């Protein structure tokens, strides 16, 4: 779900923190990608006659086609992607997960009604609401990435939190996701639309966290409290407090505790047993991969393995998969040239509270840590 209305709030109150770029602007960048969000996008977008792609055995293949071709597109643009998969959800998320089950049940009813009435537009709409990323989808995508030579990480908990940890450790430039809570977890740079379909022609939106805090005149903890007021996955919100009122209250009182002391509980009741402190703790100190010990490697594709998996097992066209392998190999030859700016700073590792550039010594130190074996690293 992410954070309700946060992107618009940032656009209204900190527009200079958002930049728009084409994909070619990220040549030479290492980017951590929220894998579950990508797979969900592929299951919705990669369709034929309104249905997910399937092979002759009735197995869904939309996620594999999307992952294969969108990853190749990034590699051809000189990007080094690392996919981060969700681990176990935090206990606080159980309420949100229950709501999702209820919404799915409602969508199933509406889909049945639309099918009975022959309403194709509603059939498409409610079919997409029933899309769910399964463990099998995840495992098949991990296998595909390994065969493509692209690294992936299994996060201990929320993928966006571990993406942010990789950014803060200087291992990657940015977190790529459509969920804005990557910023709440403290990623210094967040990218939206990186994995969107080329046909949509959406520019990539780049959000800079330090500039957001600066322009909104908030600390990181105040920003987290703002996100909780807007609505997150971990707890409810105060009734009748919209985005504009939320930011005004945070600026006026500085914290949720002070806001609760100063608003009328009859007009604006807080949820019973409101777990906002626990939600704040999850954002401030999430369970994440150890970013400093992760060793990311991008390898040559295993062409024979890809043909066996994608063609023999999943029934993709052999010509297309071999052509994709050639593109991956060619992209590796072109991506050996680095970005000029990476010779001077470790991009993406600057704290949101710091404005001065890092010293050359710290950059060398960061470069040395990349040789340390990573506990969660799965690229092969």
Curated annotation (Swiss-Prot):
Record's subcellular location: Nucleus, Nucleolus; Nucleus, Nucleoplasm; Mitochondrion
Alphabetized UniProt keyword annotations: DNA damage, DNA repair, DNA replication, Endonuclease, Exonuclease, Hydrolase, Magnesium, Metal-binding, Mitochondrion, Nuclease, Nucleus, Phosphoprotein
Entry EC no(s): 3.1.-.-
CDD domains: PIN_FEN1 (cd09867)
Post-translational modification: Phosphorylated. Phosphorylation upon DNA damage induces relocalization to the nuclear plasma.
Record note on cofactor: Binds 2 magnesium ions per subunit. They probably participate in the reaction catalyzed by the enzyme. May bind an additional third magnesium ion after substrate binding.
Transmembrane segments: none
Chain sites annotated for binding Mg(2+) 2: 179, 181, 233
Region of interest (Interaction with PCNA), residue spans: 336-344
GO cellular component terms, A-Z: mitochondrion; nucleolus; nucleoplasm; nucleus
GO biological process terms on file: base-excision repair; DNA replication, removal of RNA primer; retina development in camera-type eye
InterPro entries: 5-3_exonuclease_C_sf, Flap_endonuc, HhH2, PIN-like_dom_sf, XPG-I_dom, XPG/Rad2, XPG_CS, XPG_DNA_repair_N
Region annotation N-domain: where it falls in the sequence: 1-104
Oligomeric form and interacting partners: Interacts with PCNA. Three molecules of fen1 bind to one PCNA trimer with each molecule binding to one PCNA monomer. PCNA stimulates the nuclease activity without altering cleavage specificity.
PANTHER family the record matches: FLAP ENDONUCLEASE 1, FLAP ENDONUCLEASE FAMILY MEMBER
Function: Structure-specific nuclease with 5'-flap endonuclease and 5'-3' exonuclease activities involved in DNA replication and repair. During DNA replication, cleaves the 5'-overhanging flap structure that is generated by displacement synthesis when DNA polymerase encounters the 5'-end of a downstream Okazaki fragment. It enters the flap from the 5'-end and then tracks to cleave the flap base, leaving a nick for ligation. Also involved in the long patch base excision repair (LP-BER) pathway, by cleaving within the apurinic/apyrimidinic (AP) site-terminated flap.
Family in the record: Belongs to the XPG/RAD2 endonuclease family. FEN1 subfamily.
Listed name of the protein: Flap endonuclease 1
Source species: Danio rerio (Zebrafish)
């Amino acid at each position: 779900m992410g954070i309700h209305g946060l992107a618009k709030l940032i656009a209204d109150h900190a527009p200079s923190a958002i930049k728009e770029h084409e994909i070619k602007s990220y040549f030479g960048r290492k980017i951590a990608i929220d894998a579950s969000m990508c797979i969900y996008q592929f299951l919705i977008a990669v369709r034929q006659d309104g249905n997910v792609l399937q092979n002759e055995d009735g197995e869904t293949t939309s996620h594999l086609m999307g992952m294969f071709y969108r990853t190749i597109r990034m590699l051809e643009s000189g990007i080094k992607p690392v996919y981060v998969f969700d681990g176990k959800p935090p206990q606080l998320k159980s309420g949100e997960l229950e709501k999702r089950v209820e919404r799915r049940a409602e969508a199933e009813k509406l889909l049945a009604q639309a099918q009975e009435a022959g309403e194709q537009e509603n059939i498409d709409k409610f079919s997409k609401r029933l899309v769910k990323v399964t463990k099998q989808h995840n495992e098949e995508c991990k296998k595909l990435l390994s065969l493509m030579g692209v690294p992936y990480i299994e996060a201990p908990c929320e993928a966006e939190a571990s993406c942010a940890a990789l950014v803060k450790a200087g291992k990657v430039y940015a977190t790529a996701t459509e969920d804005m809570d990557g910023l709440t977890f403290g990623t210094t740079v967040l990218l939206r639309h990186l994995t969107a379909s080329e046909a949509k022609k959406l520019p990539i939106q780049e959000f800079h966290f330090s500039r957001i805090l600066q322009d909104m005149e908030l600390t990181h903890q105040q920003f987290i409290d703002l996100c909780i007021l807007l609505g997150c996955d971990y707890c409810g919100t105060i009734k009748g407090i919209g985005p504009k009122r939320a930011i005004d209250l945070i600026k006026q009182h500085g914290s949720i505790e002070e806001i609760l002391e100063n608003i009328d509980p009859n007009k604006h009741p807080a949820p019973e047993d409101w777990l906002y402190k626990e939600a704040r703790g999850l954002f401030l100190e999430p369970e994440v991969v150890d970013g400093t010990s992760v060793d990311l490697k991008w390898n040559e594709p295993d062409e024979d393995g890809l043909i066996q998996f994608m063609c023999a097992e999943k029934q993709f066209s052999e010509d297309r998969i071999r052509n994709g392998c050639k593109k991956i190999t060619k992209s590796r030859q072109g991506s050996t040239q680095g970005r000029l700016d990476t010779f001077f700073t470790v991009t993406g590792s600057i704290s949101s509270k710091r404005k001065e550039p890092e010293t050359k010594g710290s950059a060398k130190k960061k470069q040395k840590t990349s040789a340390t074996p990573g506990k969660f690293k799965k690229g092969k």
